[in-house]
């Protein structure tokens, strides 16, 4: 069994923001892969259970703000008894240029409080992360505002050009 978690913030006002890049991308994949949309859960997550190549896959879309997403991840991991190495957490990263993609196992929180919380609740760093760069603002004090703003058109085009590469990374994780 594999768990794929994609993080963002709930609500219409955040739909097209940098923090929600994965809400946009993975929702698109589910449509491209002809999967039904995630079912609405108990207010704190949307979930889709499916089979791919005879393997159960759970897609989890926490419907809490980023800093509270650990609750949904921890609850689902404990309920299904999922091995951390079978978890892929997908998120944006300001330390990577727009469109740069990295898939890695065992990473630090890199200063992300929500990721630090997930590591604490799982008692391990030993899970997969797929990061996509959204770039960094010019000044550190602008980060919170920056990630809650939409991409510029040229940045969105860069992301759109990476869709197949992102899909291949997800398929690579599923084959591990």
PLM regions: where:
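Nucleotide and nucleotide-moiety/phosphate-recognizing core
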Residues: 2-105, 116, 120, 126-130, ...
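Short glycine-enriched, charge-decorated loop/helix-capping segments at active-site entrances
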Residues: 102-108, 147-151
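Active-site PLP attachment segment
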Residues: 112
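Short, electropositive alpha-helical surface patch
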Residues: 140-160
């Amino acid at each position: 069994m594999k768990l794929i978690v994609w993080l963002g913030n709930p609500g219409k006002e955040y739909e097209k923001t940098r923090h929600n890049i994965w809400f946009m991308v993975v929702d698109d994949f589910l449509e491209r892969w002809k999967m039904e949309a995630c079912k609405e859960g108990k207010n704190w997550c949307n979930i889709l259970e499916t089979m791919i190549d005879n393997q159960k896959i759970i897609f989890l879309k926490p419907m809490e703000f980023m800093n509270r997403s650990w609750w949904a991840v921890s609850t689902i991991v404990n309920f299904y008894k999922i091995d951390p190495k079978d978890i892929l957490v997908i998120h944006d990263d300001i330390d990577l240029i727009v469109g740069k993609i990295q898939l890695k196992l065992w990473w630090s929180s890199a200063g992300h409080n929500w990721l630090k919380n997930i590591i604490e609740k799982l008692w391990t760093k030993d899970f997969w992360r797929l990061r996509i760069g959204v770039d960094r603002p010019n000044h550190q004090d602008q980060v919170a505002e920056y990630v809650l703003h939409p991409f510029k058109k040229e940045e969105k085009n860069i992301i759109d050009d990476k869709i197949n590469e992102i899909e291949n990374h997800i398929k690579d994780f599923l084959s591990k």
